[in-house]
Amino acid sequence: MSRPDPFPMAFFSDFVITGTVGGADATSTPDEVTALLGDDFVESVDRGQRLRGYDLAEFAWQRLSSEDPWDGLYAMVQAHRLEVPLLMDDLDRELRRAGFPVTEVAPDGLGCRRFVREDSRVGLLVDEGTGAVLKISTPAWFGTGPRYAAPAWSREAGRSWVEHLVGLDPDGRERWAARRGPGAAEECARWWWFLLDSCLRRTPEGPDRVGSPWAGLALWLVGKCRTAGVLDRAEAALEVAGRVLLPPDEAVRACLDAMPVSRAEVATRHTTAYTRENLVAVNRSRRAKALALAAGAQLRRGVREPALRAEVAAWLELRPVLM
């Protein structure tokens, strides 16, 4: 089904497939978005948050203080503003034709169906009654798999378990897990993620986090989540860096070691098209960009080793053209 300009169907399908609007995505800086989309926008800025709108497209950034750079928060297409509704059936048909179908996940309980394209981390909210797409955003806060499943255990149980685990040595933790862990692999994966989430809720913020018993338990649980298939190597590194569980140099090494491709071979927007045939290369590039950003955030914490700083800087220089 075709749509009238200025918002043809390709505008929406491209955003779902690539996570970008005119080349700008949730990781683009304000200046990069301006260079790509122009200066015809409305914007609100305060000390810690910046929100910019280009008609349907919206970008948000955040920072801890006025001395910090703006970090991308999300990119969104506000489809509910359309005069002619965008129907999910039509968009789904176009995405399937292109070879990039979305997956429906549990509804939000507030009148919306939810769909996700996992590799681009794009989520869609759809009105249950009319079938009209309301919002398309990245990164999605919902998805498939154990990390997004409703927990089968209470928050009180999680708190009790991790408060017990934090006082045990590694052997004691292993014995406890062998006694208490679920038998089925899928339920076990959900359980390990639930324990990690429960632990992170108890882990102190600030400079006392690294090296604390809670950070040590969180690192152990990240390893268990990886063994259970909840996290792959790159996702584990992103958790460790993003949650500030290791000193900066060690966190950077974890990110760089998890890079799925070298700088010389990584796919860029200049060399590689978003096609089904290129999906492996595209997704490696996406993962490399996420790891580069996570490593870059560690530079603000004070990475000491010059070689690590140089390698991160080289990846960050590539970041604007990664997929």
Predicted stretch roles:
Residues 1-323:
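Short helix/turn-capping signatures at newly exposed starts of structured segments
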